[in-house]
């Protein structure tokens, strides 16, 4: 099976970017509560 590098990178970015964005929002709200 041939691995599509660009597809792999696009999938990784598609997963990592929203996750990190939600993580940053969570940290901001958590720090505001303290």
From Swiss-Prot:
It is found in: Plastid, Chloroplast thylakoid membrane. It holds the Pfam family PsbM. It comes from the Eukaryota. The keyword S-adenosyl-L-methionine does not apply. Its main location: plastid. GO terms for cellular component: chloroplast thylakoid membrane; photosystem II. The keyword Chloroplast applies. The chain crosses the membrane at residues 5-25. It is a single-pass membrane protein. GO terms for biological process: photosynthesis, light reaction. Keywords: Chloroplast, Membrane, Photosynthesis, Photosystem II, Plastid, Reaction center, Thylakoid, Transmembrane, Transmembrane helix. One of the components of the core complex of photosystem II (PSII). PSII is a light-driven water:plastoquinone oxidoreductase that uses light energy to abstract electrons from H(2)O, generating O(2) and a proton gradient subsequently used for ATP formation. It consists of a core antenna complex that captures photons, and an electron transfer chain that converts photonic excitation into a charge separation. This subunit is found at the monomer-monomer interface. Belongs to the PsbM family. PSII is composed of 1 copy each of membrane proteins PsbA, PsbB, PsbC, PsbD, PsbE, PsbF, PsbH, PsbI, PsbJ, PsbK, PsbL, PsbM, PsbT, PsbX, PsbY, PsbZ, Psb30/Ycf12, at least 3 peripheral proteins of the oxygen-evolving complex and a large number of cofactors. It forms dimeric complexes. PANTHER family: PHOTOSYSTEM II REACTION CENTER PROTEIN M. This is Photosystem II reaction center protein M. It comes from Nephroselmis olivacea (Green alga). The gene is psbM.
């Amino acid at each position: 099976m041939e691995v599509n590098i660009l597809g792999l990178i696009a999938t990784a970015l598609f997963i990592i970017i929203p996750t990190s964005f939600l993580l940053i929002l969570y940290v901001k709200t958590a720090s505001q509560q303290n």
